[in-house]
Each structure stands twice: as C-alpha cells, then as structure tokens.
Amino acid sequence: TPHQLDSMVNHQNWPLLLSDRISWEDQTMTERQNSETYVLSVPLKKNLKANVFGGVIKGQNLANLFSELTVGYHDSINFNKLPIPFACVSENIVNGDEVVFHNGVLATAMRASMAIPGVFTPVRLGDKILVDGGMKNNFPTNIARAMGADVIIGVDVQNDLRTADELNNLSEIFNQIINLTGQTRYEENIKLATVYIKVDVKGYSAASFNIPALDTLVNRGEEAAREQWTALQKLKKEIGLPENYVAPRHGPFSSLWASKDIFVKEITFDGIEDSDKKWIMHRCHLKENSKMRMEQLYEALTTLRGSQAYSNVSYKLTDTPQGYQLHFILEEKYERNLNLGIRFDSEEIASLLLNVRSRFDTRVPSWVSVTGRLGKRYLARVEYTLAPMQMRNFNFAYQFEYNDINIYDHGRRSYNTTYKYHSGEFGFSDVWFRNLRFGAGLNFEFFKYKDFLYNTGGQRLEVKPQHFFSYFAQLHYNTYNKGYFPSKGTDVQGRYSLYTDNLTHYKGHAPFSALAASWAGVFSLTDRFALIPSLYGRVLIGKNIPYPYLNAMGGENFGHYLPQQLPFAGITNLEIVDNSVLVTSLKLRQRIGSKNYVTFTGNVAFRNDNFFDIWGAKPVWGGSVGYGYDSLFGPLEASLGYSSRSHKVGFYVNLGYVF
C-alpha cells in the first residue's frame, strides 16, 4: 500500500543500504576498529575481471533487502501472476539489447534493473551482463501498454536535460549522456500516458535519500499530482466511475519475513567450509526438519557477513511440499586491501597510517597485515593471523616504534624523550556474541631510550635499555551503535599484565603487574541530548616499577602516546602520575543539526602510590568544553580545558580518526 511504501522508504538506513558496508552492530570488533581508523579502503581484487566489469558498489545490502521483501517468491515465477502484475527493464551491455523481465527470480530482476553503470556492479545472468534499463527505456509506458493497460497514469521523476551552463562536473555529464541515449524513446513514451505527471526533482538525484530530501520529494510529488487533479477527475468520468467512487486498496501486504516461524526441511550451503557450516548452524540454532524464526535467518546472514571470511552472502528460501529449502550462497574472500588513515592535530601536526591486508588461500584461513605510520612518531607492524575456527584467532606480531614525546609536570614541560621500541607478541583471541572479545598471550618488549632533554631545574632520570617478557589477559565488551558520537551502548574493558625479565622473575624478585579497567555508557535522554558517565583507572602492583610502565594521564584518548595513557579533560599534555589512578568522568553532549556536537566534560582523578590510600591525597579535577563535527573523514574536534593540576587553559584540535 502507499502507506507501507512510505514507511519502508523512511525507515531505511539509506547510507548503509546504498553501500557495501556492514552495519556497525553486525561487524566484528576488528572491523569496527578498522572502520573508525581508515578513511579509505581500496580492494586489490584477485579477480581482475570483477574490476573491469564492476562498479563502485556491489549492492550486497540492496540485494539482501530485495531478498527479504520477496521471501516466498524466490523461485522462478511469472510476474504477471503476482498480486499486482510487475515488469522491469534492464539493458544487456553485451549487445545493447533491452531486456524486459516478465518472469524469473523477482529479487534478481529488481537488482538488475537498478544497476546504474559505474555505480553498482552489473548482474550476470547466463550470457548477459545487465545494467539499469534507464539508458534504453526510462519511462516504459510502452511495456505497460503491451501488458494490457488501457489507462496509464505516468509519473515522471527524471531530471530535464541540462543546459551548457549546468554541465560542470563528471557526474552531471555522465547523467546527461544516459538521458540523451534514451531521449527518443522517452519522448515517444510520454505520449502513451493517459495522464502525465511531471515531478520537479531539481536539486536532487537518484542518490538523494536523506530524510529532508525524501520529505521534499514526496511533497513535490503531491503538488505535481494536485496540478493534474482536473485531468484525473476527467479521466475518472471517462472510464465511467461515479464521483464518490473510491478504488479498493490492495493489501495491506505482509511479508513472510514478518511471520513468526516457518518449517525448514533442508539447509544447504555453497562456498563454505564444513567447519564453518557446523559453526553457523550451532551459533544461530539452525536445524533441518524444524521450525525456524526469520530472525534466526537474519542473524545467520549478519554473522556470516561480519565474519570477515566472505565477501558476498545471499540466500534463497524455496517452498516445497515438504517445507522450505534454505540455501546460502557465499563467496569467500581471497582479496587484498589497501587502507589509508590520515589525521591532523595541534600537537603532532600530521600523521599518516598505511595498511595492507592480504588473505591466503590456505586450508586453515589466515592473513597477514602490514601497517606503517608516518609523522613525528613512526611505526611499523607485521601481523600474521590464523583462524582455525570462526571468531577464534591466533596472532603472531612484530612491531617497531620510534617515539618522540614531551612529558609535562603540572602544566609545564619537564622533558622530551626519544626512544626506540621493539615488541614481539603471540596471542589468542576469541569473540563471544559479537560484542565480547577475550584475548591472552605472551609479549616481548625492548625499550632503548636515546635522549632526555630537560628543562632547567627538571629532575634527571637514568633509564637504561631494558627488555621485558609479559603475560597478559584482556576482555573488551562494546555495544555502541557507532564508534564516534554514539547515541547508545556500553563499553567495558579490562587488562591484566604480569611483567618479568626472564619469564619467571624480575631482577631476581617477584614479577610486578598492572591492572587496568574502564567503563563508559551512553544514555540518550532525548534524540539529541546524551549523558556519558565513565569510570576508569590503572593500578601498578609491585615495587620499583620501571620507567616505561609508569602511569600517565592527559589528553583526549586512551593509549594515544603510551599504551598506559589515561585521558583527562583539562590536562592537554601527557603527565607522569602516581602508581594508582582512578578517574570518574561525566560528559553532557548535545547534537545540533545532524552532525554537529557540543560536549561539556567534567572529571575527577584520585591518585596515590598506594591503592589503599587513594582517597587520602587531594584529588585532581578538570573540565573542558568542545565542539565536534561527524564528517566522512572522521571527527573534526576542538576543545578548551582547565584543570587544578595545570592551572592554565589548554587548547586541542583533532581532525580525523585517532590512531
């Protein structure tokens, strides 16, 4: 019904739907981290032909939406026998023929008819390569006539041809070429409409799917229809309908997707390992010869897409006399990706992050990742991962860093230190329920400090090159609905590390250790205003803690300069603090418009070398006010802060994802 169509259009996540991205909630925690680190990801595909005949977007999310909406019609069917007869148009770019779908798989026909060249990848069907039929027939009233329509009310949402002054960029030129290609047929077909309704779509395109654009276009459509009201009333009389006649509405239609459960006779998979089949069947509680909720099917789809192992995931649900047959079609990833991150801030000016990730065609899924960071501090990391089971990985990594860091004391720069850092890590990670990840392993670290440049009167340190072996265990739980500026969710992290210099002792004595934990929650009181409380801290356990592991506090983010760094609003720079630190914080965040945010932050830090005396020392308080813009290239932020430790106003600017 019209109401259902309106509801369907307004409730879609169009930016996600018109991309190949996986929604934040359905991504693995690794994918979430990558999506909030890199501004550009370029696939270096193994199959070159896919690049030649491809588009920017594969249309995986659209294809799954079409499959969802057409559940119960996944067989090859006659479209004329649908409750409302249907046809759609594509063009076969092999020979330029117009292809009119009157039968076949409904979802495939819909996907082929909207494959805009250069935007969405074409649909391969037998020996045909099909794209959007707009270049051949973008107002197909002739097809409606051929199907038996005596009366046609034609609604035209195509842009008029542009003038020379309006052709100023590649997109406008490309759209003009498409419109010119089918212009003759278009003008002929307008004459076949009994009532022709021309909607003013100036200023909008086929990609205008944000809420303001949708509302404007719907209103313009209504205005265009009312302009033809006299013609519509005249048509009503001509076909013999009384003035008080109201046409019976079709529907309301209900999708099988909305039903509670279905009986599934058989579940089959194409392109999946037997171990993965058993895992997904168990994970999503899928059983043959049993009733299944449609939510289980959706969970299986999102789990497979978010597993990082498959590039495309689709399904067919076919009705048989014995029950439904559920068939999953998967394309395994054997691809390489080049990822790029870039950011600017008021301290390090510019930083660049490059990453290449390549999967191997091995019996046990595996991949290698090579990362490099350029800037004031630089880094190189090589990581090899084995995944014997879905969501369970063994990681082997080596990392080198050169760091150049300023350390402050009560707001004044105390000294600058430069050092080289080497680490080798063996770890195991396991993801439970998509939002919870556990990790454990062994780490080797070597610190070689080169220079300490002190301000006049600063305390001198003697830090010699030193190596450490550490055991670690960590847990991370995250239910945010997005990485930056989330409107709901919780983040909980915890890590315990035990440090030695020979795997059992440190300098002939018991090892020392560190325990760090954090909690933060986002509670939206309205759709624009949110409270974000948090509690976090780090405790060092043992005597004579080496310099590289001393607690550090300051800045906007966890672990930005040092892994143990704790953020604190009002302390702009990095300061070395006591062995036990506990911080409580509250943020008040107001969204202005759709992407602008103003945030007020207040926090208090309790600290002492002895954890049991942490309440005895005078606490440090601080606060800040900041502005942020949620851009396509990451957060653009600026803040002013003040604290009782520095006793001065600090200013900080960050442009881009933090890494």
Residue map of PLM features:
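Buried hydrophobic packing residues in well-ordered domains
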Residues: L5, G96, D132, A144, ...
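C-terminal outer-membrane beta-barrel translocator/porin domains of Gram-negative envelope proteins
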Residues: N337-I342, F472-H476, Y480-G593
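Short glycine-rich beta-strand segments
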Residues: E401-I405, N443-F447, Q493-L503, R538-L540, ...
